[in-house]
Each structure stands twice: as structure tokens, then as C-alpha cells.
From Swiss-Prot:
InterPro entries: CsrA, CsrA_sf. Its main location: cytoplasm. PANTHER family: CARBON STORAGE REGULATOR (PTHR34984:SF1). This is Translational regulator CsrA.
Length: 74
């Protein structure tokens, strides 16, 4: 993991298209702004993990449903 220090209003550039900027620092909370192309999904980590879990659950249900439907046709 690359660890960088930034101060208020400083940025980090990721590739050509993504900029992460420190917007404010209040106590132990840091607000960041992210500029990125619209086709790039940006989520908080806990939201991303929840989405992945839900997708895995849905995919599993789909496989089970397809198996059930397939066995009913036979």
C-alpha cells in the first residue's frame, strides 16, 4: 500500500483521470473530494463490500434457480 501525506486543499492524482483532494479537516474527520470519469464507480468501502455480498447472493440464487428449472424440464 502506498501511503501519502496531504494537507488541506492538496491532491493526489491517480492516472490521467482521477484526482483525490483533501476538502476539509475537522478533528478526526477528513473530507475528500474525488474527480473521476462517470463510468468509474466510487463507493465507501463498507458500501462496496455490501454490494459485492448482495451480488454474490443474487448470483448464487440465480444458479440455484436455473438448476431447479433445468431439473423440472427433464
Amino acid at each position: 500500500m502506498l501511503v501519502l501525506s496531504r494537507k488541506l486543499n492538496q491532491s493526489i492524482q491517480i492516472g490521467d483521470d482521477i484526482e483525490v483532494k483533501i476538502i476539509s479537516i475537522e478533528g478526526d474527520q477528513v473530507k475528500i473530494g474525488i474527480e473521476a470519469p462517470k463510468h468509474i464507480d466510487i463507493h465507501r468501502k463498507e458500501v462496496y463490500l455490501s454490494i459485492q455480498e448482495e451480488n454474490n447472493r443474487a448470483a448464487s440464487l440465480s444458479v440455484d434457480l436455473l438448476s431447479q428449472l433445468s431439473s423440472q424440464k427433464k
